[in-house]
Design a protein with these regions (language model features):
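Phosphate-backbone binding interfaces of nucleic-acid-interacting proteins
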Residues: 1-111
């Protein structure tokens, strides 16, 4: 399927910094609850991410990540996930987070 550039631009993908990460034992699959700061325009949002194979909560704090910020919130057990944190699968299908190679300003939009 081919989409237009205008369609792509409808997906608002922004850069944020993880400020807290904690286990999410109520999730069906191993996951972490993340709090991500997207800067002044977007603010702080929450996300649930199945990333426990490669990341500990402590290692995630301060890490910059990309997330879709304009999907509707999604209830995951007792937790409301407000953004979709982006990653790609490794050779075993486990999620590897996507982020910049250098520190960049919070809230930057991917294009």
């Amino acid at each position: 399927m081919t989409i237009s550039f205008d369609d792509f631009m409808k997906v608002d993908i922004r850069l944020g910094r993880i400020v807290t990460a904690e286990p999410f034992p109520q999730a069906r699959k191993p996951a972490l609850r993340l709090t991500i700061d997207f800067g002044d325009e977007i603010g702080v949002r929450k996300s649930s991410a199945q990333i426990t194979r490669h990341y500990t909560p402590e290692a995630l704090v301060g890490r910059q990540v990309l997330a879709v910020v304009n999907f509707p919130p999604r209830q995951i057990g007792p937790f409301m996930s407000e953004v979709l944190t982006l990653g790609v699968p490794d050779a075993d299908g486990e999620v590897v987070l996507i982020g910049p190679g250098h520190d960049v300003p919070l809230g930057g939009r991917m294009f």
